[in-house]
Regions:
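Secreted, luminal/periplasmic, and some membrane-associated catalytic domains
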Residues: 7-11, 18, 33, 43-51, ...
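Low-complexity, glycine/alanine/valine/leucine- and proline-rich hydrophobic stretches
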Residues: 611-659, 668
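Short, solvent-exposed beta-strand-terminating loops
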Residues: 353-365, 417-430
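Beta-strand elements within well-structured catalytic alpha/beta cores of enzymes
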Residues: 10-27, 40-42, 65, 176-177, ...
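Conserved alpha/beta core surface patches that mediate binding of polyanionic ligands
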Residues: 408, 517-525, 628-636
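A long, amphipathic alpha-helix that forms part
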Residues: 2-8, 24-26, 388-413, 423, ...
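Cytosolic-side transmembrane helix boundary signature
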Residues: 114-140
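Active-site-surrounding "flap" and adjacent substrate/cofactor-binding loops of secreted or lumenal enzymes
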Residues: 34-38
Length: 688
């Protein structure tokens, strides 16, 4: 199915990458006339549904697109992975490591030498001119200053600092010679940023907030009866205020103290003052002062966390005063890193100064990879209107950047938008009357929000298409589609029920904070009797001898027999409430990945039918006792553990193409590389 490219390769290519756009919804909306710009793009070039990889998760799918490899090849196979030496879950995208801070243990001596040298030079000059007394005084001052510098550096500068190393393997298409010069904006799994010739990149999913988390918002409340939804599984910083009137002092949590050899987190004192009329709240945080009325957002506010006299970590956040009476409800966004004052060695762009350049051109923007806060609306600390306001502000800033970047004469521009995915995750409940969290009154107001986010996408596509010259090519794609999540399934509970996972006590509930702080997992498991365990979003592992720390299943025939047995049992798993099978397919890793690390990649990958998804506790490896339970959560739509064929994304192109079958996302990579190089496309997407 290969053919020569006709006409010649486009001089410029723009790729708009939208997260979580579902092929079925797009086709329905195009048929109804609600997506005129995508319809025009389809007419001009072409459209096809796009199948995500196994599993259809955001970091997995976008990394497959970025590299053209399947998850076994690029090794980003889930949000979470485990270390087989102790089964501790960690984030799969990147791993922590320690690197020297400045010169490491030599820093104090270097500081002393630098200070001493600066002062000794004039002393030497004075001595040479015969002014011995003045020279002697300066020599003494130099010695004292050098000693003070040594002591200060030793006391206040750490020998090492935390760093992050990407787990992604493979070569990205934008780093190849045919793509240069290239600009890449916010693509997932691009942190830490990698420099490439004539390239500019702003990192996306993977960049933490100032606390070192994927995103840690805060909620300040004077309501003594407030309780976050779902037991605060997403680890919102809940701060209890002593009063709903007058003046009081609290704090904002900043960077982790362990980065600087301290226990706990670095905190910034904050003073809150309620006006006598109880219609305004004044906030003092370091050198920043602002006053808000109920329902008002602040601008980005500078926050400086002083670690010691030598180190200050700079960031900024937005405040939202949801209510002031009868009780204070103050939301503080995750604290973003300030691109103008990043910590030493911490880069969020390539080249390192590009993030600062963007800030100076466009103003402050969200540097955190998961930019839109979906945790607070789930926890009941952010309302639906406030969430949509945050989405609108985030999208508006990204569109400002895109409008300017698309005018630059560069061979390739890749621009990623996350908002369709984030909106669908938390507003799906209003478009599914059968969902346990469906609310008819709220559905009348928010039932069309997902479709409206698609209309926003369509508008972005339209303004981009109009800004491009006729000889440019425009590609629009998404990493996966979406489905309702009505019922949660816990594979660890099923493994316990069937005797594959043996407990010696009750398993403790876990949350994101335990994940970040390396909490204790699996304490209730008796590994000497357990043959299998589950973790992540559909990953099942055999407790394999020679791989797992306490593995008991022999490699070879016993391993294969157990995998077959588990696969049959999971395919037969029936929800007693609905009578439906929860599992669509069970994949063996060798059947979906061309190559893989057998110590890293799950032995089985379980794919759900629409309506079902792995529960949050199951993703952390916690058997809760119930195999099935209603999902009454705000997070009501999903894709992560579903069958990829049932949650397809989209692929549009301004150039005509044909396809012999429904392409996968790596086929889109191959087609893009063909456009860039001018060589024949290997198919199934063939340029006409």
């Amino acid at each position: 199915m290969s053919a020569a490219l006709l006409p010649s390769p486009p001089r410029r290519i723009v790729v708009l990458a939208f997260d979580g756009v579902d092929a079925g919804i797009v086709q329905t909306m195009m048929a109804g006339g609600r997506l005129p710009n995508l319809t025009a793009l389809k007419t001009r070039g072409g459209f096809s549904p796009l199948t995500p990889p196994v599993p259809p998760q955001t970091p997995v799918s976008w990394t497959s697109f970025s590299t053209g490899l399947d998850p076994g090849g690029h090794q980003i196979f889930d949000f979470l992975k485990r270390d087989p030496s102790d089964m501790t879950p960690t984030f799969a995208v990147a791993q922590d490591r320690e690197v020297p801070f400045l010169l490491g243990r030599k820093t104090p001596a270097a500081a002393a030498a630098a200070v001493g040298t600066i002062l000794l030079l004039p002393a030497a000059v004075l001595a040479g001119r015969g002014r011995r007394l003045a020279a002697a005084v300066l020599f003494l001052i130099a010695a004292g200053a050098a000693a003070a510098a040594f002591a200060a550096a030793r006391a206040w500068l750490p020998a090492t600092r935390p760093s992050i190393e990407s787990n992604r393997r493979g070569t990205t298409f934008w780093s190849e010679a045919v793509a240069r010069p290239a600009t890449v904006m916010r693509m997932p799994v691009t942190f830490p940023p990698e420099s490439f010739p004539r390239g500019r990149l702003l990192s996306g999913l993977g960049v933490p907030d100032l606390s070192g988390r994927i995103g840690k918002p805060a909620y300040y409340t004077s309501d003594p009866f407030f309780a976050p939804r779902e037991g605060n599984d997403f680890s919102i910083e809940i701060v209890r205020l002593e009063s709903n009137v007058g003046r009081q002092t609290t704090r904002i949590v900043g960077p982790p103290g362990r980065a600087f050899g301290r226990a706990g987190a670095i905190e910034l004192p904050v003073t809150l003052s309620v006006s006598p009329s109880r219609d305004r709240l004044s906030i003092e945080a370091g050198g920043s002062r602002l006053t808000l009325s109920a329902g008002q957002w602040s601008d980005w506010t500078s926050l400086a966390f002083r670690v010691n006299p030598l180190i200050t970590v700079h960031g900024y956040a937005r405040f939202l005063l949801e209510t002031i009476a009868p009780e204070i409800a103050l939301y503080v966004s995750p604290v973003q890193f300030d691109p103008e004052r990043l910590p030493p060695g911490f880069d969020i762009s390539a080249p390192p100064g590009y993030a600062k350049e963007l800030l100076r051109r466009f103003g402050r923007y969200k540097t955190m990879g998961w930019a839109i806060d979906t945790w607070s609306i789930q926890s009941g600390t952010l309302s639906e209107p406030a969430f949509l306001q945050d989405v609108a502000a985030t999208v508006a800033q990204d569109r400002r950047m895109l409008r300017a970047l698309v005018k630059e004469d560069r061979r390739l521009l890749v621009h990623y938008f996350e908002f369709p995915d984030r909106v669908a995750h938390v507003f799906w409940r209003f478009r599914d009357p059968k969902h346990p969290a469906y609310d008819a009154a709220l559905a009348a107001r928010y039932g069309d929000v997902v479709e409206k986010s698609y209309e926003t996408m369509d508008a972005i596509v339209g303004e981009t298409a109009r800004a491009l010259p006729p000889d440019a090519a425009l590609l629009v794609l998404s990493d996966h589609g979406f489905a309702t999540w009505r019922r949660s399934v816990n594979y660890d509970s099923w493994l316990v029920e069937k005797g594959y996972l043996v407990l010696r006590g009750n398993a403790q509930r876990q949350n994101l904070e335990a994940l970040f702080s390396r909490g204790a997992f699996w304490e209730a498991v008796d590994w000497s009797k357990s043959r299998a365990y589950a973790m992540g979003l559909g990953d099942v592992y055999v407790n394999l001898r020679g791989r797992e720390k306490d593995g008991i299943v022999a490699p070879g025939a016993d391993y294969e027999k157990l995998r077959d047995e588990l696969s049959r049992g999971l395919l037969e798993l029936t929800d007693p409430k609905t009578g439906e099978h929860a599992v669509s397919r069970v994949f063996k890793r060798e059947n979906v990945y061309r190559r893989y690390d057998p110590r890293l990649i799950p032995d089985l990958i379980v794919a759900n039918r629409p309506g079902y998804r792995v529960s949050w506790q199951a993703s952390l490896g916690v058997p809760t006792g119930s195999v099935f339970e209603d999902n009454r959560d705000v997070w009501s739509g999903d894709h992560c553990s579903l069958d990829p064929d049932l949650v397809r994304g989209v692929f549009f192109a301004s150039r005509p193409f044909s396809s012999s079958q429904v392409p996968g996302i790596t086929d889109a990579t191959a087609a893009l590389r063909a456009l860039l190089s001018g060589k024949a496309s290997p198919g199934p997407i063939v340029w006409r």
